[in-house]
Each structure stands twice: as structure tokens, then as C-alpha cells.
Amino acid sequence: MAPRPAPNAPAVPELVLSHHPRPVTTTVDAVNERGETVPTPIAGEHPLTLYLDKRELVTLMTLGAAPEALALGYLRNQRIVRSIDELAAVQVDWDVDSVAVTSRSLARDGVTIWELAGRGDELDQRLGRRTVTTGCGQGTVFGGLMDELEAIRLPDGVQVTEAAVYSVMEQVRRHESIYKVAGAVHGCALCTNPLSGDARIVNFVEDVGRHNAVDAIAGSMWIEGVDGHDKIFYTTGRLTSEMVIKCAQMGIPVLLSRSGLTGMGHAIAQRLGMTMIGRCQGRHYLLFTGAQRFVRTGLTS
């Protein structure tokens, strides 16, 4: 059993977060099939350069709706930062299209995360190995793609009902979205997974790339202290190896998509015991992996 902290041990200071979303759409003139000029909303797309303790890591092309959560989720899903407790601040500045993430070690002791004993070499090694993924906009996964799969353990006792799958699809269909207004975005939703089947959307994020949307949800889960073991993850995009691995890292055992899947996504989901359901449209779905969790309820009419 881990020792309890001393009664007078100081609490971890709260993470300082800016709140600087960008407008998600702009309006431009387009000419329709009748030759009429029509004001038309289009999705935003902005560069956002991520710095960790003053070191530039990556420039993300993003809608800009949740930049702080996106930065945190990126660091989480790339396994660059182990815990949100390592971080002191996340500050977005759209004047220079950047987000600066500051570690507690730098804020407290003047020592960057890159200078901590054992961390610098580990991070340099991880950042030196890249896999360009199949995401629209080409996402990148640092480190060996399969390196840490053996350490991931999804919860065994979780079930998901057919009614919950239908409920998620209906909730997403009815949700107000940027896609309905402007198109050109992918959406991801974190949902509850009640045995009653009456699922609820906890968080819904859209971005110009599905890898950004899943990272933003991962960051929000960190900020809010949300556990993934009793949740369902929904995406409008295809179920690739990157999507499966990121959901597994968040501890989410059930993954839904209205789209299809890739061979490596299928293989990794099987290996992890994840329940992966694709081609979800209306009352149709295809259960690909994790049938041990799935409970049919006969709601197909």
C-alpha cells in the first residue's frame, strides 16, 4: 500500500489556464448554382505552436475552439508529460499563434523538464522517433507506436449495451455542431455508459483533424479529473491505430464511429480487449472487437 501523504503536506497548486478560444467560423461570399452571391460560414484553421518549458515541439493546425485542452491532450497522448501535476501553467497567445506550457519544476525551481535527471534523455529519444499517421492533416505520434501497449490495461468488468450505442448516436445526431453549419471538421464525443442505455454527452469537441479533437478531449479529461473506465468514446472519423491507442491511453474501453476502421486499428483493439464498433448509422452497426462486453437489447426496429 502506498504511504499516505503527511497531514500537513502542501496541496499541489492549481494549474493556471488561459481561456482564449478563437471564433470557430468566419463568413465568406460564395456563388451558388444560380449565380447568386451567398454569405457562407466556413471553418476556421489556425496555426498553434506548442512550447514546453520554452522548447518548441510542434505546430498544430486547429480550429482554435479549445487550445488549452488541445495542448494538454497532445502532451498526454504523446507521453511527453506523465501527469497533469507536472505542469504549472498553460498560456495561449493568439497574437503570436502559440501556447506556452510551463512545468512545475521550472516555475518552482527554475529547472526545465528537459533538465530533470533522467527526463531529458528520455524525452529527446522519444521526440527523435516519429510515426506520421493516417489522420487528415497527417498527425504524428512520437516514440515507438507500439512501445507502451503492454502496459495498458483496460477495465475488465465494463459492459456496453446496444441501447447505449443507439443512445450515443442519437445524442450526437441532435447535438448542435460546427459541422452542421460549416462542414470541414471532425467531431469526437466523450459519453457516459449507463447500463440503462440512456447515454449522455460529457464533452463534444470538433476540429479540423480528428487527432486534434481526441487530444482536446484527453486534455479536458485531465483538467477536470475525469476517468475513462466507465465512458464511451465516439468519433466521426475512421478507427485507426492512432485513435485506438489514444483512447486506450485514456482508459476508455468502448470506441464507436460512424466510419470504418483500418487493419492495424482492428489488430490493436483486439490485442487490448477494446470494444470497437464501426459503421454506426441509425440502427445499423458492426461490432468488430470486444464482444465480451457487448449486451444486445433487441432495439433494432
Spell out what each predicted region is.
Residues 128-133, 295-301:
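Phosphate/diphosphate-binding glycine-rich loops and adjacent basic-rich segments that engage nucleotide
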Residues 2-204, 208:
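Intrinsically disordered, low-complexity regions enriched in acidic/Ser/Thr/Pro/Gln residues
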Residues 80-82, 90-93, 147, 224, ...:
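Short C-terminal domain-edge/linker segments immediately following a structured domain
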Residues 210-288, 296-300:
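Feature captures the catalytic cores and cofactor-binding loops of soluble hydro-lyases/lyases
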Residues 81, 149, 292-295, 301:
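Residue-level detector of solvent-exposed, low-hydrophobicity positions
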Residues 191-192, 288-290:
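Short beta-strand-to-turn element immediately C-terminal to the catalytic PLP-Schiff-base lysine
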